[in-house]
Each structure stands twice: as structure tokens, then as C-alpha cells.
Amino acid sequence: MLSPEAERVLRYLVEVEELAEEVLADKRQIVDLDTKRNQNREGLRALQKDLSLSEDVMVCFGNMFIKMPHPETKEMIEKDQDHLDKEIEKLRKQLKVKVNRLFEAQGKPELKGFNLNPLNQDELKALKVILKG
């Protein structure tokens, strides 16, 4: 039987390890989804270079090739890209929360600037006007 102090340390280490595993799993999933997104981007680029819209194209699904119409293929890949973008953005938001929880569990201060959002077009124009003037 462990002493109360040893049990407390063990619980702390288990909690930190679980949080770190969640962070690493999310990072790995983001990398995997980004790889798929890049492959889709390559496919879209190849479809744009091929100007023969009337012909069918060969598409690889896993380990199987299927012949599909050019416009439907492009639309399908674009929908997949939108889905991947949303999924990656959702994972990144979750990752920020999980990293903050991990830092909190470790007793470290919250990362400064980690929750910043980019300026939109209107904000950027207003900032340029202010800086010029």
C-alpha cells in the first residue's frame, strides 16, 4: 500500500500523462487530415490541368480505382476538402483547450498569444488607415 503522498504523486502523473496523450493524439490526427487535404489539393490541381471535361477520370478509393465523370469527381473532392478544413479547424480549437488544461495540470502559466485570431479584411483595412494617418 502506498503512502498518501505517493498516491497523490501517482494520480498527478497519471492525469498529466493522460492529458499529454490526448494532445499528441489530436496533433497526430491533424497531421493525418492535413496529409489527406494535400493529396486532395494535388488531385484538384491535376483535374484543373486536364481540360477535357467530357472524359471520365480514374479516382483511387483506398486500394480500388473507379472511373467517374470529371465534374462529379471535382465536386466530390471539393466537398471533401471543405469537410477536412472544418474538421482540422475543430481539432485545432480542441487542441488549444487541451494544451491549456495540460499546462494548468503541470502548474505552468497559460501560453501568451496562443488564443489569437487573425484579422479579417475590414479590421486589416482599418488598421492600415490608422497606421498611415
From Swiss-Prot:
| Family annotation (InterPro entries) | PDRG1, PFD_beta-like
Main localisation:
cytoplasm
What's this protein's family per the entry? Belongs to the prefoldin subunit beta family.
Tagged with keyword Cytoplasm: yes
Question: Could you tell me in which tissues this protein is expressed?
Answer: Predominantly expressed in normal testis and exhibits reduced but detectable expression in other organs.
Its recorded name reads: p53 and DNA damage-regulated protein 1
What is its subcellular localisation?
Answer: Cytoplasm
- Which GO terms fall under molecular function for this chain's record? unfolded protein binding
Q: Which Pfam families match?
A: Prefoldin_2 (PF01920)
Q: What induces it?
A: By UV irradiation and repressed by p53/TP53.
Coiled-coil spans in chain: none
| Entry GO CC | cytoplasm; prefoldin complex; protein folding chaperone complex; RPAP3/R2TP/prefoldin-like complex
Q: Any idea which UniProt keywords this protein has?
A: Chaperone, Cytoplasm
Summary of subunit composition and partner proteins: Component of the PAQosome complex which is responsible for the biogenesis of several protein complexes and which consists of R2TP complex members RUVBL1, RUVBL2, RPAP3 and PIH1D1, URI complex members PFDN2, PFDN6, PDRG1, UXT and URI1 as well as ASDURF, POLR2E and DNAAF10/WDR92.
What does the function comment of this entry state? May play a role in chaperone-mediated protein folding.
Any one Gene Ontology BP term: protein stabilization
Gene label:
PDRG1
| Keyword Chaperone annotated | yes
